[in-house]
Amino acid sequence: MEVEILDQRDNPLLYRKEVKFVVRHEDSGTPQKSEVLRKLAAILDVDKEVVLIDRMESEFGKRETKGYAKIYKSMEHLEDIEPEHMVERHKKVLEELESESEESEESESEESEEEE
């Protein structure tokens, strides 16, 4: 999975950056928001909790997904500006990220114990 930033602009009135991106996924279906959020946060060098993926759209037959994300200066700004349902969706994505990281840590510790 490869993420490319197409356009990025500052929106100082709303304390955020707005990013248009494309995800190329040759070997699999449409990626989950949690995977894309992790990649975007790494590319933009920001904390995962301030990256809100507004939308992701795939076209039939193409192996790419176009999306739009908002990167806030803080979680407080995100919660103040975004509608409540978007904040709830964002929190669910963050929970998915946490559970994925916990599962990968557990599997790594089990593998290291087996090697010993």
Curated annotation (Swiss-Prot):
Task: Please give the Gene Ontology molecular function terms for this protein.
Answer: structural constituent of ribosome
Going by the UniProt record, its keywords in alphabetical order are: Ribonucleoprotein, Ribosomal protein
The UniProt annotation puts the region (Disordered) at 81-116
Where along the chain is composition biased (Acidic residues)?
A: 96-116
Swiss-Prot/TrEMBL GO biological process terms: translation
The GO cellular component terms are: ribonucleoprotein complex; ribosome
Which PROSITE patterns does this UniProt record tie to the protein? RIBOSOMAL_S24E
HAMAP family of this UniProt entry?
Ribosomal_eS24 (MF_00545)
Q: Which family does it belong to?
A: Belongs to the eukaryotic ribosomal protein eS24 family.
Q: What is this protein called?
A: Small ribosomal subunit protein eS24
Q: Which organism is it from?
A: Methanopyrus kandleri (strain AV19 / DSM 6324 / JCM 9639 / NBRC 100938)
Kindly list the organism's lineage.
Answer: Archaea, Methanobacteriati, Methanobacteriota, Methanomada group, Methanopyri
